[in-house]
From Swiss-Prot:
This is Cell division topological specificity factor. GO terms for biological process: cell division; regulation of division septum assembly. Gene3D superfamilies: Cell division topological specificity factor MinE (3.30.1070.10). Pfam families: MinE (PF03776). Prevents the cell division inhibition by proteins MinC and MinD at internal division sites while permitting inhibition at polar sites. This ensures cell division at the proper site by restricting the formation of a division septum at the midpoint of the long axis of the cell. Belongs to the MinE family. It comes from the Bacteria. Keywords: Cell cycle, Cell division. The gene is minE. HAMAP family: MinE (MF_00262).
């Protein structure tokens, strides 16, 4: 009976160890995803400043303007700016 208890306890211990390892791995993966997708604090203000400058010269709606900051190749940041321009919207 003691021999059987020894093997059963060992199997139960493996299950709890595996679940703890899985939980820790999920925490690490969530942390890595968060750090990769985190936008800098200055991005909303930068967006507003760029819109102010653009609106001095052309009519730009919020829907026709988008700005994204992506990480490429580790520590290279790429600022992507998309603006829909229409000929009839140019200001004189």
């Amino acid at each position: 009976m003691a021999l059987l208890d020894y093997f059963l306890r060992k199997k139960e211990k493996q299950v709890t160890t595996a679940s703890k390892a899985k939980e820790r791995l999920q925490i690490i993966v969530a942390h890595e995803r968060n750090s990769r997708n985190k936008q800098p604090d200055y991005l909303p203000q930068l967006t507003e400043d760029i819109l102010k400058v653009l609106r001095k010269y052309i009519k730009v709606s919020d829907e026709s303007f988008s700005i994204n900051l992506d990480k490429k190749d580790g520590d290279l940041n790429v600022l992507e700016l998309n603006i829909e321009l229409h000929d009839e919207q140019t200001a004189d």
